[in-house]
Amino acid sequence: MLQTRAKLQQALNSLLAAKSQKDRAAAGDRLVTIVRAHVASTVTAVEEPFPVERVLRRTLQELGDIEAPVSRLTDDELETFNRLLPWGAMTLDQAGREVGQVWSADKRGVPSGLIDPRQTQFDKVFPLKGRTVMEIGCFEGIHTLGLLLLGAEVTAVDGRVENVMKTMSRLWAYGRACELLLWNVERPAPETLPKAWDVLHHIGVLYHLSNPVEHLNELLPRTGAGLLLDTHVMSDEAETSESYAVGGQTFRTRRKPEVYADSSPFAGMEDHAKYLVLDDLVRLIASHGFGDLRIVSDRDERNGRRVTIWAFR
């Protein structure tokens, strides 16, 4: 098994390093050969194809028959595109070429699909087509692109100008565009922010904030119909280290250092963040009139407990 993994990793590295269509095809064939040989030698079959192949299949399905502008770039032009900005995540074009770059082997180390499964699941229950969506923390535009492919009208914000530029570039690569605003959400909302929207899309940001309660108090009243929130939380009061009061209510929190705030695109904008207790977070959301609140995912990750919450008025 270890030998097979080593062969797979070597073949994957060759695929990721390939510059021409011919080299990519050859590397892909080697991957398929290794996987087939492993399946033939074991009792339990591999249920899914290798991740890169699976992501490419998803990409083709998500884009449909429309050729993305990035697919018309030559290999040299795409290489230049990928070098111009400090990417931390990548997707694939319709030929299986990388758009962007990976951050590291253990973080965003493989290509992402264009529509996040959390978005797909939410869309099945609450269709996004034709709805206005406020996306908090667009990062490099992958979630933004997913929302647009699902038919939403998106306004996306981020506190780092390089993330706004990367989002703009990735959307161009796939023939999409939306309203993009530079806004550090630790600060008051700018006048240019829309006054209202149908859905608040909030994935992977809240647990990076030093003021999560004030932040949600500003955004939830402007949210007319639905919330998709994905964040780390504290399980109970025993895990908290402090509390703070906002608007006459007390919230239990645990202070977390944001040690890479100045160097990592994945960190928050301040030197610390506050993790909320799940019960307090649910109470806060409900206080803004979201009567139908569902915890659709509750899991343990590297940085602790993480939940996906849907809420509807």
Question: Where do the language-model regions lie?
Answer:
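Non-catalytic N-terminal targeting/anchoring module and adjacent flexible stem/linker
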Residues: 1-101, 120, 172, 290-292, ...
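Conserved SAM-binding loop of SAM-dependent methyltransferases across substrates and taxa
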Residues: 140-150
